[in-house]
Amino acid sequence: LSTLLLMSLLGFGVLSTITGCETNPVTGKQQLSLVSSAQELSVGQQQYKPSQQSQGGAYTIDPSLNQYVDNIGQTLAKLSGQPNLPYEFIVLNNDVPNAWALPGGKIAINRGLLILLEDEAQLAAVLGHEVVHAAARHGASQMSQGMLLQLGTQVLDQASGNSAYSQIAGIGASAIQARYGRSQELEADHYGINYMVEAGYNPHAAVELQQTFLRLSRDSSQGNWLNNLFASHPPSAERVQKNKARAALLPKGKRNTEAYQKATKQIRIDSSAYETHEKAITEAKKKSWANALT
């Protein structure tokens, strides 16, 4: 690349950083944002239903479970840096132990994760973490970085005429938009614990949650779907240790184990049937029809 082009790219990056920064509503720090709040809300609203449908759809067998999860989520959301976002919380009929947040406060948690949790405090740890991603505009920040990379791709294409540059930059854009960074995950852990403690929950539940995710990430028998899961929420020993240190400084709170076990009773009753179904699907994909039918 020519020196002039490199200087132009550098200048654009600096200019974008200056004009595209905003104050993080949760931390009070400056962060990149080329996406307006209105655009962010629109993206979340437009993608919420399609995202649900592509991941098993809403869990409708026990409507009271959705209400239970939403009540806890809304309580935590009111304590966030953006309490007036149009938050929604839904349970998805999906075996993968995952939860996610779209821009604008559109949050989902899978049936497969609810099965692994032991009490309401652990559920609050999950939902508090996702609320931070939404309130801190992490999704908007990811989209902004993707926009800069896409612009860089276009500039490189025009300057070089070489599609290889486009492919490399395109992969980078996809990777950034599909994965929260280390700082964003630590931020969501830290402030998520704040929210759950303010709501009266035991912060050690957040430690237990990360220990569970770390154990799953190290279990090679679980297959590639776990690699895809942890691409968006990468667990680490660092996160476990930071959560431990933070929880040790905070007051103990409620666990609400009995209430949680009661709320999740139906999915626990049905868990063996779901496991059988998933095994059958796996065998069918291998065209092992006899195994799929047993």
Predicted regions and their residues:
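A Zn2+-metalloprotease active-site environment signal
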Residues: 2-294
